[in-house]
Swiss-Prot record:
Keywords: Endoplasmic reticulum, Lipid biosynthesis, Lipid metabolism, NADP, Oxidoreductase, Steroid biosynthesis. This is 17-beta-hydroxysteroid dehydrogenase type 3. The keyword Lipid metabolism applies. SUPFAM superfamilies: NAD(P)-binding Rossmann-fold domains. It comes from the Eukaryota. Its EC number is 1.1.1.62, 1.1.1.64. The lineage of its organism: Eukaryota, Metazoa, Chordata, Craniata, Vertebrata. One of its GO terms (cellular component) is endoplasmic reticulum membrane. Coiled coil: none annotated. Its main location: endoplasmic reticulum. It comes from Rattus norvegicus. It is an enzyme of class 1 (oxidoreductase). Belongs to the short-chain dehydrogenases/reductases (SDR) family. 17-beta-HSD 3 subfamily. Substrate binds at S181.
Length: 306
């Protein structure tokens, strides 16, 4: 019995040590300059960004272009993409290709594949997604959009990865960034469908990373919490709530840190705090009522009127 307890104690100490080492790497990288553009350019000439018309996708489009990559912008609204395309070309000198596609539909991927043909794609950012309810809501009150959420949040990641990964494999290099969410790390009641869809992205990404990391391909899932974007109704920014530009610039520092990252130091600290709460307590009725009130009040008081 004594030997067993000693083994358990050593295992716990080892887990804590690994977490401390990982967090120290975050601290170090957070104070470093951004990843050299040469690293991203070594992956290939082009970056493909889904959901590039707004928010995090738009920010990735500009930032990757600043690092010297040509960019393919894919989103639903052509007018937005054309404006962004002109600004990227004017300010960075990178080439831009625009592809109009509605990711809530299934019949778009042959068209996208045709548009990507012949491009040396080194970076794929699977960013497109939809949140059926910003304020906490029961599943049946949002289930009318369930098929659109599945297509946009899950099917898009699978299909776009299929289109691009096979070419990365043949060149033995590439970077795929899949944007999940902090609410995909553990089940979140009142965001059930969104949480489940983002959990798929987490599991899919981490499994793929194991399959393809020995082939020179980095596949990383990002699990941010609060980012001020059109999808979150432009939440007021703070030390925790980042602008899309802030989040993207910091996230690119961590592309070599491992298969999963929150994307910024503030969210990593928040994740550590949340993970300290035992599931039995987190999912208790009392805790859920408390979180529901606190989170609803926070959202209502911080949603911008932009």
């Amino acid at each position: 019995m004594e030997q067993f307890l000693l083994s358990v104690g050593l295992l716990v100490c080892l887990v804590c040590l690994v977490k401390c080492v990982r967090f120290s790497r975050y601290l170090f990288l957070s104070f470093c300059k951004a990843l050299p553009g040469s690293f991203l350019r070594s992956m290939g000439q082009w970056a493909v960004i889904t959901g590039a018309g707004d928010g995090i996708g738009k920010a990735y489009s500009f930032e990757l272009a600043r690092h010297g990559l040509n960019v393919v912008l894919i989103s639903r609204t052509l007018e937005k993409l054309q404006v962004i395309s002109e600004e990227i070309e004017r300010t960075t000198g990178s080439r831009v290709k625009v592809v109009q596609a509605d990711f809530t539909r299934e019949d778009i991927y042959d068209h996208i594949e045709e548009q990507l043909k012949g491009l040396e794609i080194g970076v794929l950012v699977n960013n497109v997604g939809m949140l059926p309810n910003l304020l906490p809501s029961h599943f049946l009150s949002t289930s009318g959009e369930s098929q659109s959420v599945i297509h946009c949040n899950i099917t898009s990641v699978v299909k776009m990865t299929q289109l691009v990964l096979k070419h990365m494999e043949s060149r033995r290099r590439g970077l795929i960034l899949n944007i999940s969410s902090g609410v995909g790390v553990r089940p979140w009641p009142l965001y059930s469908l969104y949480s489940a869809s983002k959990a798929f992205v987490c599991t899919f990404s981490k499994a793929l990373n194991v399959e393809y990391r020995d082939k020179g391909i980095i596949i990383q899932v990002l699990t941010p919490y609060s980012v001020s974007t059109p999808m979150t109704k432009y939440l007021n920014t703070s030390r925790v709530t980042k602008t899309a530009d802030e989040f993207v610039k910091e996230s690119l520092k961590y592309v070599t840190i491992g298969a999963e990252t929150c994307g910024c130091l503030a969210h990593e600290i928040l994740a550590i705090i949340l993970n300290l709460i035992p599931s039995r307590i987190f999912y208790s009725s009392t805790t859920q009522r408390f979180l529901l009130k606190q989170f609803s009040d926070y959202l209502k008081s911080n949603i911008s009127n932009r």
